[in-house]
From Swiss-Prot:
Coiled coil: none annotated. It is found in: Lysosome membrane. Zn(2+) 2 binds at residues 788, 835, 838. This is GATOR2 complex protein MIOS. The gene is MIOS. Zn(2+) 3 binds at residues 827, 830, 858. Belongs to the WD repeat mio family. The GATOR2 complex is negatively regulated by the upstream amino acid sensors CASTOR1 and SESN2, which sequester the GATOR2 complex in absence of amino acids. In the presence of abundant amino acids, GATOR2 is released from CASTOR1 and SESN2 and activated. The modification Phosphoserine is found at residues 759, 766.
Length: 875
């Protein structure tokens, strides 16, 4: 409080009262006006609140500072510091029959008159009142008074005097304080430290000082100019703020040598700083002649790493009103609420709205925090958008081990839910590629095995100018059609399309039977027709019509096919051309398009986008010449790449074109999971090293880690290292000799495998293997196992007492377990250890180190056991 500018204080125990003090004390009552009109005489504070004047106290002139008594009773007791140094206890509407009525009007008088700058009630012992005064060369500047002490004339000199000539009541003048501190210096600000009622922090003339009332002869201090407005963070009692001119300093009392943080200097002098009582680490500052209050959020302030490192804060500004602000006061309980007052006593009730912090979990849960409230976004019961999200799909697929089946590759589409036809086509394509690559490598190693994974586009290009057409008879018709002679490359293309199986026998019968079993009647009939077997096509349609889930319209189509005639101007051809446009099933449409097409012109079949790519490509391999086929495959490949259609992998293979196609697919769907598994399946090394492929793989690994699917990520890494040996990282940790510092494991001939993260030696578990019990560099003996006392490197199976009779391990069945049992493990605290198998056996029943006289609780030091992989948590 400075000059005649008003200050404002909230009542500590009445959330609806505050006092404005300048030349007089005015008590106001705040009430809500949401559902009521503004009362006569009330002052509008905001749209939702108004203030009513309850009482005015003009008995204490020359006010310089005011402090509200912290206890509930008496409820309206205030201490007023005056320009002459006196501290007067006064009240606003105090009941005169109260047992504390003797406190009203009590004065505390220093020896020498000078201005009282600050007052502070002790939060623990509420009867103690600290006063900070200006400097006097013969007096102390920090006086601590006990407002309820029982004085006697022998101990404390007292006198009763009249306040004025016209008054009849007398008051008690107290002239002897409990404590006197800060001699020959000025005190500009005060605050008690909440953690101890005996500690007082004072902003003196040139330093901040901490006084311990248990030993007043000593004090802890730090030289600084920032001695005004000292205030303690109510949520972090070791954090203190003070200011000087336009700069705020933040102190940590545990490291009191210098400020831990200095806020940005303001162009105008500061007049007030205050911590928010309802929000952790929120500091408000006000400068002279300003209508802006600056807020500094230290909630997320990191701990400084070095002496010169300053933590960062979040700064923002709010404007409660248009006029200059004289002072403000935080509400003690309402969140982020404050009252501001202008120099002409205009008041505003203002709430600082929090920044909304959003958190989107890796499992698509959305939450946000606003103030003390935490909100969660829940999906509507009938809203299936969450199930359609690719992140949810990838998470469920990861749980089902999607992509990890390397034997029956086609099964991966079932693990994906068997809902996406593109995924089904992709995994069947990869399955056929793997199958025929292995078959070709067995017949002619190094010949054409790699060509299979290059896709049909490359296969077709390798056979240009080698194929001629010939006429073939229809089955069920007296007719012949031109069909290309199938060379080895076209047969391979048909095999990749799934129409025929291994061998040179071009028989689509097994494929038709599989389609019939799956209920794909229309597709089976179309494939039979494309192979010039109209009789088989009609039989399939009739079977489909008579099945439980069949369509009776298939009978109509079968009847239409049975009346096929080769005459160009026939009524049948005219009616079928019209009927084709009315059919919904694409395979029925292309059947009539094929029958009504001119010789060599099959656009109605080749460009029907609803027909599977593999069927269109197989059709093209049977009916198009080399030039037409190459042109068609090139055009279809470009369409698939642009659309990101996974069926196009059949054409591009796992080549650079395949990466381009997969890039479009990932851009469209975000499915890095499928992209990663697909590219790992059989891509050459130059494709695997493509930046895009590595980006998909690393993002999928990070995604698994974010979901806490650490086991799944480990399985993926193992799967990746099998298909791409170059991806296996080098060992990052090895056991070194204590004497020479060289790696023990590198020269161990008995080691069949190097484990990631551990070094192992002599681990085969077979007594015939050589033992490495000494350092290969300096020949010093290796440490001994704390349990069997045999040098490390000796296999557990050959250690005496290595296993009990009832704990025999079948090493032939569990070789990996035998290797792990021989690993050397040790405690990072006490450095004791031994064979991993022995240590596991010991710590099943004990928590303490097995070494005598060692009291280390080795097993309890490892906290990683508390982390539970997400896939093991039951929903």
């Amino acid at each position: 409080m400075s000059g005649t500018k008003p200050d404002i204080l909230w009542a500590p125990h009445h959330v609806d009262r505050f006092v404005v003090c300048d030349s007089e004390l005015s008590l106001y009552h705040v009430e809500s006006t949401v559902n009521s009109e503004l009362k006569a005489g009330s002052l509008r504070l905001s749209e939702d609140s108004a203030a009513t004047l309850l009482s005015i106290n003009s008995d204490t002139p020359y006010m310089k500072c005011v402090a509200w008594y912290l206890n509930y009773d008496p409820e309206c007791l205030l201490a007023v510091g005056q320009a002459n140094g006196r501290v007067v206890l006064t009240s606003l509407g105090q009941d005169h029959n109260s047992k504390f009525k003797d406190l009203i009007g009590k004065e505390f008088v220093p020896k020498h008159a000078r201005q009282c700058n600050t007052l502070a009630w002790n939060p623990l012992d509420s009867n103690w009142l600290a006063a900070g005064l200006d400097k006097h060369r013969a007096d102390f500047s920090v006086l601590i008074w006990d407002i309820c002490s029982k004085y006697t004339p022998d101990i404390v000199p007292m006198e009763k005097v009249k306040l004025s000539a016209g008054e009849t009541e007398t008051t008690l003048l107290v002239t002897k304080p409990l404590y006197e501190l800060g001699q020959n210096d000025a005190c500009l600000s005060l605050c008690w430290l909440p953690r101890d009622q005996k500690l007082l922090l004072a902003g003196m003339h040139r330093n901040l000082a901490i006084f311990d009332l248990r030993n007043t002869s000593q004090k802890m201090f730090v030289n600084t100019k920032a001695v005004q407005g000292v205030t303690v963070d109510p949520y972090f009692h070791d954090r203190v703020a003070s200011f000087y001119e336009g700069q705020v300093a933040i102190w940590d009392l545990r490291k009191f040598e210098k400020p831990v943080l200095t806020l940005t200097e303001q162009p105008k002098p500061l007049t007030k700083v205050a911590w928010c009582p309802t929000r952790t680490g929120l500091l408000a500052t006000l400068t002279r002649d300003s209508n802006i209050i600056r807020l500094y959020d230290m909630q997320h302030t990191p701990t400084p790493i070095g002496d010169e490192t300053e933590p960062t804060i979040i700064e923002r500004s709010v404007q409660p009103c248009d006029n200059y602000i004289a002072s403000f006061a935080w509400h003690p309980t309402s969140q982020n609420r404050m009252i501001v007052v202008t120099p002409n006593r205009t008041m505003s009730d203002f709430t600082v709205f929090e920044r909304i912090s959003l958190a989107w979990s890796p499992i698509t849960s959305l939450m946000w925090a606003c103030g003390r409230h935490l909100y969660e976004c829940t999906e509507e019961e009938n809203d299936n958008s969450l199930e359609k999200d690719i992140a949810t799909k990838m998470r469920l697929r990861a749980l089902s081990r999607y992509g990890l089946d390397t034997e029956q590759v086609w099964r991966n589409h079932i693990l994906a839910g068997n809902e996406d036809p593109q995924l089904k086509s992709l995994w069947y394509t990869l399955h056929f590629m793997k199958q025929y690559t292995e078959d070709m490598d067995q017949k002619s190693p190094g010949n054409k095995g790699s060509l299979v994974y290059a896709g049909i586009k490359s296969i077709v290009k390798s056979s240009l100018g080698m194929v001629e057409s010939s006429r073939h008879n229809w089955s069920g018709l007296d007719k012949q059609s031109d069909i290309q002679n199938l060379n080895e490359e076209r047969i391979l293309a048909l095999q990749l399309c799934g129409w025929i199986k291994k061998g040179t026998d071009v028989d689509v019968g097994p494929f038709l039977n599989s389609l019939v079993q799956e209920g794909e009647w229309e597709r089976a009939a179309a494939v039979a027709l494309f192979n010039l077997d109209i009789r088989r096509a009609i039989q399939i349609l009739n079977e489909g019509a008579s099945s439980e889930k069949g369509d009776l319209n298939l009978n109509v189509v079968a009847m239409a096919l049975s009346g096929y005639t080769d005459e160009k101007n026939s009524l049948w051809r005219e009616m079928c051309s019209t009927l084709r446009l009315q059919l919904n099933n694409p395979y029925l449409c292309v059947m009539f398009a094929f029958l009504t097409s001119e010789t060599g012109s099959y656009d109605g079949v080749l460009y029907e986008n609803k027909v599977a790519v593999r069927d269109r490509v197989a059709f093209a391999c049977k009916f198009l010449s080399d030039t037409q086929l190459n042109r068609y495959i090139e055009k279809l490949t470009n369409e698939m790449k642009e659309a990101g259609n996974l069926e196009g992998i059949l054409l591009t293979g796992l080549t650079k074109d395949g990466v381009d196609l997969m890039e479009s697919y990932v851009d469209r769907t975000g499915d890095v999971q499928t992209a990663s598994y697909c590219m790992l399946q059989g891509s050459p090394l130059d494709v695997l090293k493509d930046e895009r492929v590595q980006y998909w793989i690393e993002n999928y690994r990070n995604l698994l880690d974010a979901w806490r699917f650490w086991h799944k990520r480990a399985e993926f890494d193992i799967h990746r290292s099998k298909l791409d040996p170059s991806s296996k990282p080098l060992a990052q940790v090895f056991v070194s000799c204590n004497f020479c510092g060289k790696s023990i494991s590198y020269s161990c001939s008995a080691v069949p495998h190097q484990g990631r993260g551990f070094s192992q030696y002599g681990v085969s578990g077979s007594p015939t293997k050589s033992k490495v019990t000494s350092c290969p560099g300096c020949r010093k003996p290796l440490p001994r196992c704390a349990l069997c006392l045999i040098n490390m490197g000796t296999p557990v199976s050959s250690c005496p007492g290595g296993t009990k009779s009832d704990e025999k391990v079948d090493l032939s069945k569990d070789k990996k377990l035998a290797q792990f049992n021989n690993w050397f493990t040790w405690c990072h605290n006490c450095r004791h250890g031994g064979h991993a198998g022995h240590m596991l056996s010991w710590f099943r029943d004990h928590a303490e180190c097995p070494v005598s006289a060692c009291t280390c609780k080795c097993m309890q030091l490892d906290t990683t056991g508390n982390l539970v992989p997400a896939e093991t948590v039951q929903p």
